[in-house]
UniProtKB/Swiss-Prot annotation:
Record keywords, A-Z: Cell cycle, Cell division, Cell shape, Cell wall biogenesis/degradation, Cytoplasm, Peptidoglycan synthesis, Pyruvate, Transferase
One Pfam assignment: EPSP_synthase
Function summary: Cell wall formation. Adds enolpyruvyl to UDP-N-acetylglucosamine.
Pathway named in the protein's UniProt entry: Cell wall biogenesis; peptidoglycan biosynthesis
Name by which UniProt lists this protein: UDP-N-acetylglucosamine 1-carboxyvinyltransferase
EC numbers, comma separated: 2.5.1.7
Positions of the catalytic residues: C118 (proton donor)
Residues binding UDP-N-acetyl-alpha-D-glucosamine: R94, K163, V164, S165, V166, D308, I330
Catalysed reactions, semicolon-separated: phosphoenolpyruvate + UDP-N-acetyl-alpha-D-glucosamine = UDP-N-acetyl-3-O-(1-carboxyvinyl)-alpha-D-glucosamine + phosphate
Organism whose genome encodes this protein: Mannheimia succiniciproducens (strain KCTC 0769BP / MBEL55E)
Subcellular locations according to the entry: Cytoplasm
Protein encoded by which gene: murA
Length: 421
């Protein structure tokens, strides 16, 4: 199994190019199933989850071609001949549930194995299923598979989301694009990745309005054509590198990114005493060589503070001046990085869905284990600033969501290497 060896006490400084957003690339790749003509995508990140999605699409009969130009992918779903996303591919990635709605909407049937992915608590597919049922689908759970069928086209419906869910919002949008009549999603997720997926679908001929608000309307059309689309920059990768500068006394410019998708994170970094400069396509954080100040965090759906930045800010708070509280309202069981940080000398305790962090001046290198994608990057960054050597185990989690992470960190001055047992 591959691991990272990180030599600490690095001040991370320089410029880093931000990749396309995984959380936009995955739904957009699955949404390409809806198109009868080829689609060209650019700025697609080279990640394990993207690779898994390619495999699922190919299994369905989609032609997926990666161009020589990095990040450019041609998708042709004109000859889909299979309607089952099998367990051996789906088991590693929860996002594979997004194959169901486009298969059902275009071909009136689909089967997806119940998915896997990060072990950060309950992420049930119930909201995906109930939304499809309201549009006329017949759903059954059989031997670990979600099987969906519909006689003719799905029917537009008014769907209220009991809980804000990015995944379910995207599933219903995909289903509604080819449905008969109008679908209205109330209490919809507002994340930038939902907006990007809607822009992509509209470029293919869908009629979606309201994406980015809590009420999204979709007027069904009979077919979708091809298009060309560029995936939005990864706001979570951007935030991760900004935190890297803040905790290491460094200065990092994130290039090819957008500040308007990261306002809650930028506000908290400024509250922590960091100097931030913004241009149209870059964000620079200068720590001015100062230790960050502790900041209280409460994760919320967009435009609130993103849960995918919680682990990175936990790290910031355990090395900050002062005491802070971090409350996780989105996912249960998402503090598994804290016991690992404690092994490195952090002082923190967990009370229910809240972590209390008492800032210390220094962390010490240790052997630690990654438990999920965002927790794993916080441990790597902790290793960059700790004294001595840190070994991070189970780094396959990082490869699911961060493109060329060790190469990018080395470009900023980190001393990090990948090795196998």
């Amino acid at each position: 199994m591959e691991k990272f060896r990180v030599y600490g006490q690095s001040r991370l400084t320089g410029t880093v190019d931000i990749s396309g957003a995984k959380n936009a690339a995955l739904p957009i790749l699955f949404a390409s199933i809806l198109a009868e003509e080829p689609v060209i995508l650019t700025n697609v990140p080279d990640l394990k989850d993207v690779e898994t999605t390619f495999k699922i699409l190919r299994k369905l009969g989609v032609n997926v071609e990666c161009a020589e130009e990095p990040g450019k992918v041609l998708i042709d779903a004109g000859n889909i001949n299979q309607f089952v996303a099998p367990y051996e591919l789906v088991k590693t990635m929860r996002a594979s549930i997004w194959a169901l709605a486009p298969l059902l909407s275009r071909f009136h049937e689909g089967q997806v194995s119940l998915p896997g992915g990060c072990t950060i608590g309950a992420r049930p597919v119930d909201m995906h299923i109930s939304g499809l049922e309201k549009m006329g689908a017949a759903i059954e759970l059989d031997e670990g598979y979600v099987k969906a069928t519909v006689n003719g086209r799905l029917k537009g419906a008014r769907i209220y989301m009991d809980k804000v869910s990015v995944g379910a919002t995207l599933s219903i949008i995909m289903a509604a694009t080819l449905a008969e009549g109008k679908t209205v999603i109330e209490n919809a997720a507002r994340e930038p990745e939902v907006v990007d997926t809607a822009i992509f679908l509209n470029a293919m001929g869908a009629k979606i309005s309201g994406a980015g608000t809590d009420t999204i309307s979709i007027e069904g059309v009979e077919r979708l054509a091809g298009c060309r689309h560029r995936i939005v920059p990864d706001r979570i990768e951007t935030g991760t590198f900004l935190v890297a500068a803040a905790i290491s006394g460094g200065r990092i410019t994130c290039r090819g990114t957008k500040a308007d998708t990261l306002e809650a994170v930028i506000e908290k970094l400024r509250e922590a005493g960091m100097q931030i400069d913004i241009t149209e396509d870059s964000i620079t954080l200068d720590s001015l060589g100062q230790r960050p100040k502790a900041v209280n965090i409460r994760t919320m759906p967009h435009p609130g503070f993103p849960t995918d930045m919680q682990a990175q800010f936990t790290l910031l708070n355990v090395v900050a001046e002062g005491t802070s509280k971090i409350t996780e309202t989105i996912f249960e069981n998402r503090f598994m990085h804290i016991p690992e940080l404690i092994r490195m000398g952090a002082k923190a305790e967990i009370e229910g869905n809240t972590a209390i962090c008492h800032g210390v001046e220094h962390l010490s290198g240790a052997q630690v284990m990654a438990t999920d994608l965002r927790a794993s990057i916080s441990l790597v960054l902790a290793g960059c600033i700790a004294s001595g050597e840190t070994i991070v185990d189970r780094i396959y989690h990082i490869d699911r969501g961060y493109e060329r992470i060790e190469e990018k960190l080395r470009g900023l001055g980190a001393r990090i290497e990948r090795f196998s047992d």
